[in-house]
Each structure stands twice: as C-alpha cells, then as structure tokens.
Amino acid sequence: MKHEILEKNIGLMALLMVLAVSIGGLTQIVPLFFQDVTNEPVEGLKPYTALQLEGRDIYIREGCVGCHSQMIRPFRAETERYGHYSVAGESVWDHPFLWGSKRTGPDLARVGGRYSDEWQRAHLYNPRNVVPESKMPAYPWLVENKLDGKYTAKKMEVMRGFGIPYTDEDIAGAQDAVKGKTEMDAIVAYLQVLGTSIKNKR
C-alpha cells in the first residue's frame, strides 16, 4: 500500500490507527488483568480502619494528592530516598488510587511510621514550625473539626462492594470508632499506615 493513498484518505488512516492501537492494547494491557501480581493484595495488606478511611477522604478533600505522589518508581534515586518501590498489590483496595503525578512535596508511599504522630500533627498544623522552607499550606482547622461518623459505615459498605474484605463487625462499629475524633486524628492515622504492608529497608 502506498503512503500517498493513506495520506489522502483520512478515513482509512484513522481506521488503521484505531486498529493499531487496539492490537497494542489487547497485547499489552489485557494480559495484566489476568496476572495475580497486578490484582492480588500483597501479603499482610489490611483494609483501612474506619478512622484511616475517614483520614483518606480528608486527604482527598484537602487536595493533598495534588502535591504528593504515592508511588515510588523503581529507580535507584527514588528507592534510596523513599524506600522499596511501589507494587500494584499495595493499591488493589484503593478506590480511587492516589498515585498522583506531581511532587511539589515528597512522595508519601512509605511515610507510615517514618515520623511520630506528634511530628505529623505539628507539620499539618503549621508546616513551617517543623520544616522552615516548606511550601505546604497549614491545616489548623483539622484540629477543630470533629468527625461524627454518620457516613463511615456506608463508605465501608461501598468499599466492600469493590472487594475490600470488611466484615459486618467492622461496618457495625465504624461510627463508634470515629465519633468524637478530630479530622487531624483521622489524617494522621491514614498517613501512619501508608506503605507499612511491605517490609521497607532503606
């Protein structure tokens, strides 16, 4: 087939492009759905507790994913700084996943347990009190806002529909688990669990 025919016939060119992309998708993407390594949770992965789940929602609400990624790429510079590279099995229960694509701030995929709860609270309340050159905004209202847990059980039921193994007991006790806690408690609980399902050697 001569290139001139393709160049003059946009419809034919578009059809062949769609065909090429479809074949590429079928051969590269579809097999991933059938590999256990991409859709099975890593050993030791536990569902978020009610408080951690609320913290995750606050993380999303406050736009943290706009400045922090949660995916360490398998490059030496990243693994030396952040720890073990991210694997798909860590994120199978994250709906939506929060890998992110921008790093105004550091990657948080392995931040769990790296700093104390008190450090995290101080940093979220006013980052410049802890890191003077920080560009991160302060979140003082997280200390004042209380959780009532009104929708926590419903959130867990929805997540169970996505295949996350929440038990009836988890769901029944969800409201009591978060009631009276602050949004700061919740987001710190969420941050402290990130990346803890994989043995992290730096």
Where are these regions (language model features)?
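Charged, low-complexity, helix/coiled-coil-prone segments
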Residues: 1-11, 61-71, 93-105
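Post-cleavage N-terminal segment of exported redox proteins
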Residues: 1-48, 162-167, 188-202
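Electron-transfer interface patches adjacent to heme c in soluble/periplasmic c-type cytochromes
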Residues: 13-22, 80-184
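A generic secondary-structure signal for well-formed alpha-helical elements
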Residues: 30-37, 62-66, 71, 75, ...
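Sequence context of c-type cytochrome heme-c attachment sites
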Residues: 32-43, 50-53, 69, 85-91, ...
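Electrostatic cytochrome c docking/interface patches
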Residues: 36-60, 72-79, 104, 174-177, ...
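The canonical Cys-X-X-Cys-His
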Residues: 55, 61-70, 120, 187, ...
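Surface-exposed patches in mature extracellular/periplasmic domains of secreted proteins
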Residues: 67, 133-138, 198-202
